């Protein structure tokens, strides 16, 4: 883990707790900020998909209504009107929104991992007992995933 390695590197270089915490927290916050931007792009695309579908529907309906004197042109224009709505809904609900949700999950996971690393590095710097550090870090795990402490 490069993040943890950089934290340990700061300890080895002899920086005090405030510097280590500040550098690592800034790194974590910037990563979260970058992930939020990516997620918001996909969320916006999910919001725009149905709207773009409705615009296509309006274009198809205008084409259909402008050629009412030709019955053969009504079907293809109606198909365009209906398909654009379908494509907009599919783009939003099958691609953009799930992708945005997955990015949000990954962002939360990375934020947690970096928070654990910051706590571990600061505990090491404070000279805490390894068993205390271990029990402190176990608190981040769900109870079912915690290994039983060795006696």
Predicted regions and their residues:
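Helix-termination/interfacial motifs at the ends of transmembrane alpha-helices
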Residues: 27-106
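Large intracellular
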Residues: 1-38, 109-151
């Amino acid at each position: 883990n490069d993040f943890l390695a950089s934290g340990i590197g700061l300890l080895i270089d002899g920086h005090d707790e405030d510097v280590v915490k500040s550098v690592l927290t800034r790194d974590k916050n910037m990563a979260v900020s970058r992930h939020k931007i990516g997620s918001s792009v996909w969320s916006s695309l999910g919001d725009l998909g149905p709207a773009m579908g409705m615009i296509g529907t309006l274009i198809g309906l205008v084409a259909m209504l402008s050629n009412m004197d030709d019955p053969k042109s009504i079907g293809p224009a109606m198909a365009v009107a209906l398909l654009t709505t379908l494509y907009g809904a599919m783009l939003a609900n099958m691609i953009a929104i799930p992708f945005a949700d997955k990015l949000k999950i990954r962002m939360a996971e990375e934020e947690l991992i970096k928070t654990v690393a910051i706590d571990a590095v600061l505990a090491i710097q404070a000279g805490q007992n390894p068993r205390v550090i271990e029990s402190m870090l176990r608190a981040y795990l769900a109870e079912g995933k915690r290994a039983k402490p060795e006696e």
